[in-house]
């Protein structure tokens, strides 16, 4: 079993670009068919580690979904980010959905 460093709804930073992001899905290993998208995907070590679907905002404030290796991410200090409130709202919404009891028939 592979343990992931980050969880759903957690806010993270891209280590190289510094962009704030929110984890929306986790894969135990690289799972895209096209390895030419990212040089990190060609590394066997990185391919075998967890990969994350992360929603971020680019320099223009546009929302983008990225697929990043665990090694490309760092922890983000919990708290509000007034410069990117939509990412705070997304993170809170995901965490709330994970904690809410599910209705059963």
Curated annotation (Swiss-Prot):
Gene3D superfamilies: Hemimethylated DNA-binding domain. GO terms for cellular component: cytoplasm. Its main location: cytoplasm. SMART domains: YccV-like. InterPro entries: Hemimethylated_DNA-bd_dom, Hemimethylated_DNA-bd_sf. Keywords: Cytoplasm, Stress response. It comes from the Bacteria. Signal peptide: none annotated. One of its GO terms (molecular function) is DNA binding. It holds the Pfam family YccV-like. It is found in: Cytoplasm. Involved in the degradation of certain denaturated proteins, including DnaA, during heat shock stress. NCBIfam families: PRK14129.1, yccV. Belongs to the HspQ family. This is Heat shock protein HspQ. It comes from Erwinia tasmaniensis (strain DSM 17950 / CFBP 7177 / CIP 109463 / NCPPB 4357 / Et1/99).
């Amino acid at each position: 079993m592979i343990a992931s460093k980050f969880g759903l709804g957690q806010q993270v930073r891209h280590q190289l670009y510094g962009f704030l992001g929110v984890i929306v899905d986790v894969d135990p290993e690289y799972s895209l068919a096209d390895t030419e998208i990212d040089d990190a995907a060609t590394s066997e070590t990185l391919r075998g580690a967890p990969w994350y679907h992360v929603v971020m905002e680019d320099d223009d404030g546009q929302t983008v979904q990225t697929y990043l290796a665990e090694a490309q991410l760092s922890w983000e200090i919990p708290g509000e980010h007034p410069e990117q409130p939509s990412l705070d709202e997304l993170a809170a919404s995901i965490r709330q959905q994970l904690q809410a009891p599910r209705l059963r028939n």
